[in-house]
Amino acid sequence: MIVGIGIDIVELERIRSLLERSRKFPERILTPREKAQFGELPPARQAEFLAGRFAAKEAYAKALGTGIGRHLSFQDIEIVSDEHGKPSIAARRDGETVHLSISHSRDYAVAQVVIERLGPMTPADACHG
């Protein structure tokens, strides 16, 4: 059963501008492992990577229903890639599967997250469905 859906779109130019103004911006968004990946990329690719991670984390927070804020930070969410480059959310709650898609164009990065709970629907789920 789907229990959350989130989507986010980011303008690459906005991320490029933030990177030019503050090299500390990636530290707010990326976990240490993500920052290591970011640092290995050529500068032209860094804004695209950061925009995709930003959009994915925002989409996940929206799917959870909390958004980024007091109870959930960018540092609480880590995007990892498998051996084929497919991204996924590293932290998961028990009994849930998280589906993540990140896409880029010349001007935008977009991410969509679907959170699926495995097993039968509970009475609490029925109230929210």
From Swiss-Prot:
Signal peptide positions (record): none
Cofactor: Mg(2+)
Record's subcellular location: Cytoplasm
Organism, as annotated: Geobacillus kaustophilus (strain HTA426)
Domain of life: Bacteria
Substrates-to-products reaction catalysed: apo-[ACP] + CoA = holo-[ACP] + adenosine 3',5'-bisphosphate + H(+)
GO molecular function, one term: holo-[acyl-carrier-protein] synthase activity
Family assignment from sequence similarity: Belongs to the P-Pant transferase superfamily. AcpS family.
GO cellular component, one term: cytosol
Protein name per its UniProtKB record: Holo-[acyl-carrier-protein] synthase
Function field: Transfers the 4'-phosphopantetheine moiety from coenzyme A to a Ser of acyl-carrier-protein.
